[in-house]
């Protein structure tokens, strides 16, 4: 598996992204993988990598980039910690359709320049918070 990272410039700032694609000759069908409200974490990245193993170039953008540099979410205590819940909800509130559509234009442009990705047709998947964004 080829894993990497890239910063994609949008109208609202620089989005840190993870990339995955199978080894060997591409280009591979492109997929944008929208995260859930728990953010970028090992479980989410493992899911994106599994998708890439099926023959896709997967881009996983950190949709919380508008919050600036933020401390990693504490998934172990989130359920019982009102302060952590409030912090997550503040970041989720920044993920709105209009902003994501602007970001998506930059992600599509990234695929057009990426030789390992097919940019003619691009899939979008999302989980939880990312599901409605994918639609």
Question: Where in this protein do the model-derived segments appear?
Answer:
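N-terminal cap/leader regions of alpha/beta-hydrolase-fold enzymes
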Residues: 1-135
């Amino acid at each position: 598996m080829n894993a990497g990272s890239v910063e994609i410039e949008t109208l609202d700032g620089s989005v840190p992204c993870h990339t995955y694609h199978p080894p060997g000759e591409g280009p591979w069908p492109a997929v944008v993988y929208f995260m859930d409200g728990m953010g970028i974490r090992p479980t989410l990245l493992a899911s994106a990598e599994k998708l890439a193993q099926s023959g896709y170039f997967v881009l996983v953008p950190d949709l919380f980039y508008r919050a600036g540099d933020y401390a990693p979410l504490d998934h172990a205590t989130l359920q019982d910690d009102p302060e952590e819940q409030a912090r997550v909800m503040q970041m989720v509130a920044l993920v709105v359709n209009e902003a994501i559509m602007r970001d998506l234009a930059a992600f599509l442009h990234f695929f057009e320049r990426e030789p390992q990705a097919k940019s003619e047709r691009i899939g979008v998947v999302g989980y939880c918070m990312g599901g409605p964004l994918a639609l």
